[in-house]
């Protein structure tokens, strides 16, 4: 299933409101939907990304009925494709993978591609670092914030590997604020059809994102 197909299905259940982005008249002179339709996304240097397990914390006891309802909006062919892609995961992991793609990853890829069409410099990342004993959370929504701002509170189990990833992320954010490029000496390629991104997980490295789901 393509990124666009997944987003279109999610959009059929979308209701404007809480999750709408602010229209700041600089990066977003209008709603993303309107800008994409008329190819009016402004040219900007943009760094954007998602976390690997955005929604896992919301799915601690997923049932087969829950999963069936989640798949109901897709065609039979699409349901088969999704099941094949996620066959090695348990129900909680399946629900997280699908909803993370619907809510975060696929919209972010579409936004990156729209910016790319407008000749913007686009840099993509995936945050995948997991703290010790975090199997029920993993790389959850918002987990990257203590790394970016180096605010690892005492109650958070923090290893030397976490500190290294934090240093890497701080450096990237500072570089981007200074120059519009988060990398150093070309070590972070711009986003393209190759789907290359920075993977923030010790040891952080450049890698290809899987766009199938």
Segments the model singles out, each with a brief description of its role:
Residues 1-5, 10-13, 74, 86-89, ...:
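Alpha-helix boundary/capping residues
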Residues 1-69, 95-117:
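Substrate-access "cap/lid" subdomains that shape
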Residues 2, 31, 75-76, 159:
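Helix N-terminus capping/helix-initiation residues
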Residues 24, 55-63, 92, 129-131, ...:
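Bulky hydrophobic/aromatic packing residues
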Residues 30, 65, 90, 94, ...:
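A near-ubiquitous, low-amplitude feature marking generic local secondary-structure context
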Residues 61-83:
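N-terminal leader/propeptide and maturation segments of large enzyme subunits in energy/redox metabolism
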Residues 76-107, 112-117, 123-129:
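Alpha/beta-hydrolase fold catalytic core
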Residues 106-213:
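Mobile gating loops/cap/lid regions near enzyme active sites that modulate substrate access
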């Amino acid at each position: 299933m393509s990124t666009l197909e997944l987003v279109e299905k999610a959009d059929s259940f979308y209701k404007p409101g809480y999750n709408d982005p602010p229209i700041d008249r600089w990066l977003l002179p209008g709603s993303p939907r309107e800008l994409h339709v008329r190819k009016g996304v402004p040219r900007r240097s943009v760094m954007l990304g998602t976390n690997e397990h955005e929604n896992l914390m919301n799915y601690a006891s997923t049932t087969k009925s829950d999963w069936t309802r989640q798949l109901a909006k897709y065609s039979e062919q699409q349901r088969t494709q999704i099941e094949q892609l996620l066959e090695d995961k348990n129900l909680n992991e399946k629900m997280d993978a699908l909803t993370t793609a619907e809510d975060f990853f696929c919209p972010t890829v579409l936004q990156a591609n729209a910016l790319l069409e407008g000749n913007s410099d686009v840099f993509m990342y995936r945050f995948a670092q997991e703290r010790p004993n975090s199997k029920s959370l993993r790389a959850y929504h918002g987990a990257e914030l203590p790394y970016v701002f180096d605010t690892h509170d005492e109650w958070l189990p923090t290893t030397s590997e976490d500190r290294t990833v934090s240093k890497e992320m701080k450096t990237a954010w500072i570089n981007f604020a200074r120059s519009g490029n988060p990398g150093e000496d070309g070590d972070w390629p711009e986003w393209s059809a190759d789907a290359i991104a920075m993977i923030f997980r010790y040891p952080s490295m450049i890698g290809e994102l899987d766009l199938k789901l």
